[in-house]
Amino acid sequence: LTCLNCPEMFCGKFQICRNGEKICFKKLHQRRP
């Protein structure tokens, strides 16, 4: 199945697909330069 982008206001910009389900989670650490 296809995973759609998660709303930024709901969960950060990170998302993963498991068993065809969409799971969102916030970013815990910032990107390193």
From Swiss-Prot:
Annotated GO molecular function terms are: potassium channel regulator activity; toxin activity
Location relative to the cell? Secreted
Q: Which InterPro entries match?
A: Snake_toxin-like_sf
Fetch the Gene3D superfamilies from UniProt: CD59
Answer yes or no on keyword Zinc. no
- Tissues expressed in: Expressed by the venom gland.
Sorted alphabetically, the Gene Ontology cellular component annotations on this record are: extracellular region
Q: Which domain of life is it from?
A: Eukaryota
Q: Where mainly located?
A: secreted
Q: Which cysteines are joined by disulfide bonds?
A: 3-24, 6-11
Annotated keywords: Blood coagulation cascade inhibiting toxin, Disulfide bond, Hemostasis impairing toxin, Ion channel impairing toxin, Neurotoxin, Potassium channel impairing toxin, Secreted, Toxin, Voltage-gated potassium channel impairing toxin
**Family (UniProt):** Belongs to the three-finger toxin family. Ancestral subfamily. Orphan group II sub-subfamily.
Instruction: Give a short account of what the protein does.
Output: Possible voltage-gated potassium channel (Kv) blocker. Decreases amplitude of compound action potential and conduction velocity in toad sciatic nerve. Has only mild anticoagulant activity even at a concentration of 5ug/ml. Shows no cytotoxicity towards human cell lines.
Quote the protein name from its UniProt record: Neurotoxin Nk-3FTx
